[in-house]
Amino acid sequence: MSKTHFGFESVEETEKAKKVAGVFHSVASNYDLMNDLMSAGMHRAWKAFTIAQANVRPGFKVLDIAAGTGDLTRAFAKAAGPTGEVWHTDINESMLRVGRDRLLDKGVVTPSLLCDAEKLPFPNNYFDVVTVAFGLRNMTHKDAALAEMRRVAKPGGRVMVLEFSKVWEPLKKAYDLYSFKVLPWLGDRFAKDADSYRYLAESIRMHPDQDTLKTMMEQAGLDAVKYYNLSGGVVALHVGSKY
């Protein structure tokens, strides 16, 4: 059986899926609060930039993968309007449930679906925009997931990946201190769960850097791939087109 990584730990591929599921079952109820605390609210700016770059218009079909608590889904549903079609999807039932409930609380009625990004249950050439925010690094077969995202995008459509990335070198020492000391402390203090936030820090370090992910998207068949560094490379938004 093939090995992969869960944070810094080497595990069987099937074990990683179970461990990642356990992390997100654990953090689901505190997810938005912890995002605000960990990023000092910056995650809202990163998502706002992604929403602006997506440029969703009335009538668009949009797939939001690893959509979690539904921040992007809600914005896309508003932009696509009643003639559009926006799917809120996640592989984790706890995250999907929290997101679905919050969307309904905001008056957003849109389909929520439990699904695996590596085996998307959608037809070829269907979506104008496909997005995944802070989800790709948790996927076991990132290449398969990227290929699936391209498959379901329409010709002329775009695939967008918002993810933690490699910080600029002058920031690295302070960022490492924050990641491996402060994040687990915040997790323990506010969510009673240091281990899940230790995994977060480790998973970020194991994720491909900006240029490597760009190459992976090109190898998945996407064209004109580019990326935007945000907050000194703490996060990067990659955008690829399907021609």
Curated annotation (Swiss-Prot):
UniProt entry keywords in alphabetical sequence: Menaquinone biosynthesis, Methyltransferase, S-adenosyl-L-methionine, Transferase, Ubiquinone biosynthesis
Binding site for S-adenosyl-L-methionine: T69, D90, D116, A117
Listed EC numbers: 2.1.1.163, 2.1.1.201
UniProt-listed PROSITE patterns: SAM_MT_UBIE, UBIE_1
Pathway of action: Quinol/quinone metabolism; menaquinone biosynthesis; menaquinol from 1,4-dihydroxy-2-naphthoate: step 2/2; Cofactor biosynthesis; ubiquinone biosynthesis
Membrane spanning stretches: none
GO biological process annotation, one example: methylation
Coiled coil is among the record's keywords: no
InterPro entries, alphabetized: SAM-dependent_MTases_sf (IPR029063), UbiE/COQ5_MeTrFase (IPR004033), UbiE/COQ5_MeTrFase_CS (IPR023576)
GO molecular function list: 2-methoxy-6-polyprenyl-1,4-benzoquinol methyltransferase activity; demethylmenaquinone methyltransferase activity
Family annotation (SUPFAM superfamilies): S-adenosyl-L-methionine-dependent methyltransferases
Catalyzed reactions per annotation: a 2-demethylmenaquinol + S-adenosyl-L-methionine = a menaquinol + S-adenosyl-L-homocysteine + H(+); a 2-methoxy-6-(all-trans-polyprenyl)benzene-1,4-diol + S-adenosyl-L-methionine = a 5-methoxy-2-methyl-3-(all-trans-polyprenyl)benzene-1,4-diol + S-adenosyl-L-homocysteine + H(+)
Role: Methyltransferase required for the conversion of demethylmenaquinol (DMKH2) to menaquinol (MKH2) and the conversion of 2-polyprenyl-6-methoxy-1,4-benzoquinol (DDMQH2) to 2-polyprenyl-3-methyl-6-methoxy-1,4-benzoquinol (DMQH2).
HAMAP family (alphabetical): MenG_UbiE_methyltr
Stated family: Belongs to the class I-like SAM-binding methyltransferase superfamily. MenG/UbiE family.
Full protein name: Ubiquinone/menaquinone biosynthesis C-methyltransferase UbiE
